[in-house]
């Protein structure tokens, strides 16, 4: 079976390509192409192809944070001791003690828990994503690390990644990708070298 399957690689790859736009399962696809279902399923798994399913989002913050830094306009979710995500709904910048930008979103990881902001696609189609992060508490700390990820039901792919020092930041230039309904695009921020001190971070993602 091994040698026979290798000899039919081109036919298996044709079936895999068809799976990207076909809701048929591996058994029906294999039957359609005269292939072994188990072997085709292995190809689909290896290449992360197959019918798309909505991504189940876990680890959501459940505790509200209100009047962060004493401001009525800075509120969010998380834990006072981190991790957390907050938004400033006003046209003024506030110290919380890092800088909460006007109309901005700030995130703060813990030493072991990263924090993310994301978007779950309501469509099947093409999108363009870009992102920026910047140190929001540049007077201290050692910087941070960031990722922009495309999370589907079959894989998590990195669209961009970077590490920055104190007062620094990072940017993902516009990237175009195909998404399915239920896929998630997220901006993730973590501590640099496990140190989360002063890691309040400006988080911007545009889709």
Regions found by a protein language model. Name each.
Residues 1-207:
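Low-complexity, glycine/serine/threonine/alanine-rich intrinsically disordered linker
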């Amino acid at each position: 079976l091994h040698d026979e399957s290798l000899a039919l690689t081109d036919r298996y790859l044709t079936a895999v390509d068809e799976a990207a736009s076909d809701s048929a399962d591996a058994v029906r696809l294999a039957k359609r192409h005269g292939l072994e279902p188990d072997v085709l399923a292995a190809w689909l798994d290896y290449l992360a192809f197959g019918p798309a399913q909505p991504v189940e989002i876990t680890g959501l913050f459940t505790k509200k944070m209100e009047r962060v830094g004493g401001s009525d306009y800075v509120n969010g979710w998380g834990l006072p001791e981190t991790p957390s995500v907050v938004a400033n709904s006003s046209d003024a910048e506030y110290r919380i003690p890092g800088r909460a930008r006007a109309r901005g979103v700030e995130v703060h990881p813990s030493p072991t828990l990263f924090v993310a902001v994301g978007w779950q696609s309501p469509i099947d189609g093409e999108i363009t994503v870009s992102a920026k992060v910047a140190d929001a508490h540049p007077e201290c700390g050692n910087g941070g690390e960031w990722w922009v990820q495309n999370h589907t039901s079959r894989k998590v792919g990195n669209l961009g990644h970077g590490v920055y020092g104190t007062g620094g930041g990072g940017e993902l230039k516009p990237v175009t990708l195909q998404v399915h309904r239920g896929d998630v695009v997220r901006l993730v921020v973590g501590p640099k070298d496990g140190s989360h001190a002063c890691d309040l971070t400006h988080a911007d993602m545009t889709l």
